[in-house]
Amino acid sequence: LQWDFLSDFFRVPPPFFLTGGTALSAFYLQHRYSEDLDLFTLDSEAFNRTPMYLADAAAKIGASAVSLQTAPQFRRYKIERRGESVIVDFVREVVPQIEEEKNIFEGIVVDTVTEIISNKICAVVSRAEIKDYIDLYCLNRAGYPLENYLDFAQRKDAGVSPAMVAYLFSEIKLAKVPDFVIVSITVAELEEFFQTLAQKLAVRSFPS
């Protein structure tokens, strides 16, 4: 259902791009399951047309769509078809983009790794969900060192600092690796990685 919806939504592409965990997993890392879709736009008029775009794409794939939440810059829908469902979040992005040019995979407009990792660092500061830590660990393992993206994250959110991120990383405690992870990771590996990174960031924050 996810793939059918995205394929039709971007058939005549509106000015939106896929970002977040699904974009990261489906198009870059293949590291975990992600059930929802995050579609962002920088265009206010396009955001206002969200109900039309959604209804058209859902109808063409034989799905129904129900509005779950509406806010000035956020809309959440549930798409259903034959027992399957997916949550789709539409966001009017107001934060400046580090890389305005996005990637295109099989016709689907996808956010860049630089944008996604910067947003993930911001997310750790604002909400600290385990999926964000998993994503950051797997990004680092794939060759994207987190410390290289802190400055980008700070451009998006002034509340991000090496000291704050170091503290949050040092506090991570896991009972188990979540079931949505599909690559081989152990709790020990995760905790060791974030403890080591926390120490590096602490030194960066308070050099002797």
What is each PLM-predicted segment?
Residues 1-208:
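Compositionally biased terminal segments of proteins
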